[in-house]
Amino acid sequence: NSIGSLYFTKEAYDKLYPGYGSSYVNFYGGIGLLFEQASSRGHMQETTTLPITFAFTIRNQFAASLATVRASAGEKEMLRKLRKDFFSSAMAQAKASPIKAYVFGDSKDVSRTNAFINLLLLHQIEVYESNQVITSNGKTFEKGKYFIVPTELSNYIMVRSAFE
């Protein structure tokens, strides 16, 4: 290109895993992009194609960031529609799913349950405390010792990913 960068455009990672920062936004109606930059390993590293300097790596990241911002601004209406369609599709999938809620809890390890609840809340997933005893698949859940996450939520894709 105009600044002398080489490109690799093949997808070589699992972008469906929400633990990657570049793919997390995919679970909330965004478009996850991954810009990988070879390391200069300090000030400079010799490679088989060209020497990579720290300044060169910074310039590449900056150029990629500006190009992304420009492209996003130029396509803002399409991106808004994509996000709206994503959440509409998520709600339709949730309504069509036979799973209407996820029930969880560990009465023997309350700390573990609380840690999971905090993780769900961090990701803006609604969690409700039980108010009655239920039995499901031969397991009895006591009042106040289990929690419920409904699936009919706009962030259904993330909810499903967290539980499946």
Where do the language-model regions lie?
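Intrinsic-disorder/low-complexity accessory segments
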Residues: N1-L6, E11-Y17, G21-E164
